Amino acid sequence: MKTDVVIVGCGVAGLYAALNLPREKQILIITKSDRKSSDSFLAQGGICVLRDEKDYESFFQDTLKAGHYENNRESVEIMIRSSRGIIEELMSWGVEFEQKDGELLYTREGAHSRNRILYHEDITGEEITGKLL
């Protein structure tokens, strides 16, 4: 078997990477157990997203604080700025987040100072990995 890319792990990061590689590539995803044992599948919480431009500075500061200011600032910027597009891409693949009257619902978790977490019931990880597979 010829393989162009080997991805170790079947969590969200590995699955998302596989889906963003060129279609002609032969991709092999390996895991030490099964998909239901991945940390991503077991994750109950949600996924943080930049709600609007007014949210940027507090999101940036919350992320730095949560990382004890050891974060790579450029990586934090990329994560925050790309979050909305990634959410839209996940939704285009069928991932469902909680909504009310057609509007996404946001909650607050961990180090976040405002509601910016999208979630699916209490099984966000299962929802995302299930749809990416």
Positions of predicted regions on the chain:
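Conserved N-terminal/central alpha/beta ligand/cofactor-binding core
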Residues: 35-133
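N-terminal Rossmann-like FAD-binding beta1-loop-alpha1 element of flavoenzymes
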Residues: 3-29
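A short, basic/flexible loop-to-alpha-helix module at the beginning of a structural domain
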Residues: 1-2, 109
